[in-house]
Amino acid sequence: VHSASMNFTGSYQKEVRRRVNEILRDLELQLPFANEFTHYAVSASGIFNEATADQKEKLCGKIYPWKRTRLVGDSITAFQGATLGRPGVLAICGTGTSIIACNKEEEFTQLGGWGPLLDDVGSAYWIALKCILASIAEFELTGPETAITPALCEWYEIKNVQGLIPVIYHPEFTRDKFAILAARLDKELGTTDPVYRQICRDAGEAVGNLTLQAVEKSGLDTSPLPLFFSGGVLQFNREAMKSFEATIRSKHKVMLSQPRLPTVLGAAMLALRDADVEITDNLVRQLETTYKNVNELLSN
C-alpha cells in the first residue's frame, strides 16, 4: 500500500504517470524480491466511480498491466475504508465536498466532487469564499460588520478588503490555500463572530442536504443510517458539524462514525477483493496494525 498526491484531471498526464511509476517502484523495493503482483488498485481524484478502459490505459499503460488494474475515484476507496465495503453513506467535506452512498445491492451513488470552480457546497474552499464575500459586502455597505475583515487585513497586511484581490488572484493562491484560510478563520473566529458562524451553519446544512439527496437517490433504507464523515470541515469546524448532524437527524435515525480505515487501506481492500480474498475482522486488524507501524517508522 502506498499513497501520493494524484489528480487525474487537474494535473498534467505526464506528471500523474510519473507519480504512479514512482509509487510502484517504491512498493517493489519494499517487498521481498520473489513477490509477484497479481492485482492492482489505484485511486485518483478527478475520476467518478470506476475508470473507463481508456482512462486506465492512459494512466497505467506501459507502467503495469492496466487490464489487471482497478482504477477508481478516491471517494470509492475512501468509502471502502470507511465502511469496510458495507452499505452506508460517507460524507467527505474538506477542501472539496463529495458524498457517496452504497445500497444493499452494492450500487453506488455519488453526489458532489465537482471541484471548487463548480461549487463544492459546504467545503473549506466554499467557506473561505463566503467569508471573503462577507468582507466585501461589509466594505460595500451591503452587509453587516464582521470580524472576518480585520482578521483578513491583519494576516495579509492590507488596509481593506480591496488589497486582498491581488493576493487571491495570484496563480500561487491555490484552492488548498483557500482551505487553509478557512481553517485559520475557524481557529480565530469559530465561536465569536455571528457572520462567520452563520456561514459555517450554512455550510453544514448544505452538506447535510446533499447527503440526504444521495441517500434518497441510492435507495439505502437501513435504519439506523450508517453515516461516516471525514474531512477537516466536519472533523474540526464545530458549527458546521452541528448543523450537518441536525440536518441529517431531522430525517433519519443515524449511527454516526468516523471511517474505520484510512483511504489508502480502502485501495488495499479493493485489490484483495479482486484477488478473491475474504475481508475478515482479523484481516482488517492486520491492515490497521501494519499501517500504524509503517507510519510510526516513517515518523521516527
What are these regions (language model features)?
Residues K67-A91, E107:
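Conserved phosphate-binding catalytic cores of ATP/NTP-utilizing and phosphoryl-transfer enzymes
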Residues V1-F37, A82-P87, L133-N300:
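ATP-binding/phosphotransfer module of carbohydrate and carboxylate kinases, centering on a glycine-rich
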Residues C60-Y64, R68, E107-G115, A246-M255:
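Glycine/charged-rich beta-loop-alpha catalytic/anionic-binding loops adjacent to active sites
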Residues S3, V72, L111:
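Hydrophobic residues at beta-strand termini and immediately following loops
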Residues G46-E50, T95-T97, L234-Q235:
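Gly/Ser/Thr-rich loops at beta-strand to alpha-helix junctions
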Residues R86-G143, N300:
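Glycine-rich phosphate-binding loop of actin/hexokinase-like ATP-binding domains
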Residues F8-T9, R25-R70, A82-T83:
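Short beta-strand-loop/turn "lid" adjacent to the catalytic site in phosphate-handling enzymes
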Residues T77-A78, S98-I100, V264:
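Short gly/pro/ser/thr-enriched loop/turn and capping motifs at secondary-structure boundaries
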